[in-house]
Design a protein with these regions (language model features):
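Surface-exposed helix-capping loop/turn segments at secondary-structure junctions
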Residues: 35-43, 98-100, 129-136
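Non-catalytic terminal regions of proteins
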Residues: 9, 45-49
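Short active-site segment of divalent metal-dependent hydrolases/proteases
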Residues: 87-95
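Active-site scaffold of zinc-dependent metalloenzymes
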Residues: 49-80, 97
């Protein structure tokens, strides 16, 4: 993907990218997270998928049981959205999610403290992009 280096921007639509290209962005973002945010004793896997019609729209999700970050290419419209989704879901990977659903039922998604933390971490997208874009 290095040949795209000069053509790839945060505003580049994911519709213009192949799945392997998006996978590379996800992989480099996770590597950046491991270096800058830390990691657990077990790693995290990732995949780029198309979310079927009828599901609640989301840029991505973290599957705690499979230890996998999924990015949904049909809902993450730009490179920026992909990076933000990975930062958000990587934060969940780092969190203790044992009481996540219990807290969710009490306060809802928008006020959930772990979701708030993940949304704050999304703001690192610019710093992350500055570091990873040279590797793409």
């Amino acid at each position: 993907m290095s040949y795209l280096c000069n053509m790839l921007y945060l505003k580049t639509p994911t519709a213009e990218l192949t799945t392997p290209m998006i996978r590379t962005i996800v992989c480099e973002t996770i590597r950046w997270c491991e270096t800058n945010l830390g990691a657990k004793s077990y790693g995290v896997d990732y995949s780029v998928r198309t979310l079927p019609v009828g599901y609640t729209p989301a840029y991505g999700m973290y599957d705690y049981n499979k230890r996998t970050i999924m990015v949904f290419r049909n809902y993450a419209p730009t490179v920026k959205a992909v990076i933000r989704a990975v930062l958000h879901e990587y934060t969940h990977y780092l969190q203790n999610l044992r009481w996540y659903n219990h807290t969710l039922s009490k306060v809802g998604y928008n006020k959930h403290p772990q979701e708030r933390e993940a949304r704050v971490m999304e703001e690192l997208y610019s710093q992350c992009w500055g570091d990873i874009r040279v590797k793409l």
